[in-house]
Amino acid sequence: MNARPLSVAVIGAGPAGIYASDILSKSGLDVSIDLFERLPAPYGLVRYGVAPDHPRIKQIIVALYKILQRGDIRLIGNVEVGRDVSVAELREHYDALVFSTGADTDAPLDIPGVDAPECYGGADFVSWYDGHPDHPRTWDLSAKEVAVIGVGNVGLDIARILAKHAEDLMVTEVPANVAEILRTNQATDVHVFGRRGPAQVKFTPLELRELGKQPDVNVLVDEEDFEYDEGSQAALAASNQQRQVVKALEGYAMAEPEDLTASHRIHIHLFSAPHEVLTDEDGHVRALRTERTRLTGDGTVTGTGVYRDWPVQAVYRAVGYASTPVKGLPFDSENHVLPNAGGRVLGEDGEPITGVYATGWVRRGPVGLIGSTKSDAQETITNLVADAQAGLLHADTDDASQVGHDAVTVLLTRRGVPFTTWQGWELLDAYERQLGQDYGEVVVTSGQSKGRERVKVVSREAMTELPRSEERRVGKECR
């Protein structure tokens, strides 16, 4: 083993990267850990992928905060690997690299017309309303009737945000630009489409039940969409969660007409496969054409040749997330992951690249929640520790002074990269919370007055400059 601590860079400061760093720090190795993040703020999809009206899920940040607050894991934010520093350079400065860059782009949907201007990626919309600094500040919400393709929780999030009254989102952490545009939202009817049946939808029961609790929003499901074959029955028998989902869907389907008086509606359509986005003579969305499907016996479906056109003026794709390639590493473009075995990244020859690892969605694809992320990180770090104990991990340099945090931050400073730190994030976090307090009370649809926990800062420049300015101010006061 080296006389100096093992130096490890973890790339990606979402849950996967933070949990991997935490597990490594407690592994018993003498280790120095730097956690890189391409955005100025940590937490990944918990900050930029969870709907703003889901503070319960955002409580995960409390656990992640406690890990980073300890100080034994150093955050280096606003640094993009492949742009500000290369993989090859990181391998010179660290004994091992762990990639946890996640999956934050939309999986493709290959149907005619999907490139129309009012066809949007669900991940892009989520990034917009969550204040991602690399996404546009504006969004067209003029459509009164909207289609959402995909029956997972992201599809429900999109439908709920579009159907919800703007004032009920003003109490969340949405940025100022998002709040302003949400007030112009014209959507009254949001149609959610899934190609299979109730036994196959990917909603979780809690998310689905929550959909029906939105003020002045009705959820409608067609009674004809409840069909089950042998495969469906087996799926329901094996999963209590799926039985709860079906029960919730049946509850919506059995609602009495006199109770469906809300001004906004979410329609869930099953056995409806997207076939084509129809446009008018100017190329703008006018309808979504779907094909009715039927079960084949094993839970899969086939088309029936029966089509229906749904008048909509916008279409959102929510058919899954995909990882993006890491410049300088092999990439499995079919599965959208870094090729790996047990978290060890594989080269073009199929052999492990010594000292390079992957964890989280970039390792296994966009499936699983926090529990899966933790077990995934555990396996990857276990293999990293084994490789370290076998003496396999060494930085690509013989100069010990070029290994680790100080050498990398000198390199970034020399290049003019305005990287952020954990201390800087705490200053920005406090600033956002103060913006929430300063906003005051908001009257929501129910008539209640509520305060705001925070208001997100969106601009990358502001996110990097605000904490630096505050650090300079505090420094002057301490002189």
Model regions and ranges:
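Beta1/beta-strand and adjacent pyrophosphate-binding region of the FAD-binding site
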Residues: A3-G14, A143-I149
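N-terminal Rossmann-like FAD-binding beta1-loop-alpha1 element of flavoenzymes
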Residues: V8-L29, I158-L162
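Glycine-rich FAD pyrophosphate-binding loop
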Residues: L29-P42, L169, N177-V178, R195
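N-terminal Rossmann-like dinucleotide/flavin-binding domain of flavoprotein oxidoreductases
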Residues: P40-A96, Q244-S263, H267
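Glycine-rich dinucleotide-binding loop and its adjacent helix/turn
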Residues: D106-T184, V337-L346
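FAD-site-proximal beta/loop scaffold in flavoenzymes
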Residues: E118-P136, V277-D280, H284, T296-R364
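Dinucleotide-binding/catalytic capping subdomain of oxidoreductase cores
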Residues: R160-V306, L384, A388-L392, D396-D399
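C-terminal, flexible cofactor-proximal segment of oxidoreductases
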Residues: V345-R473
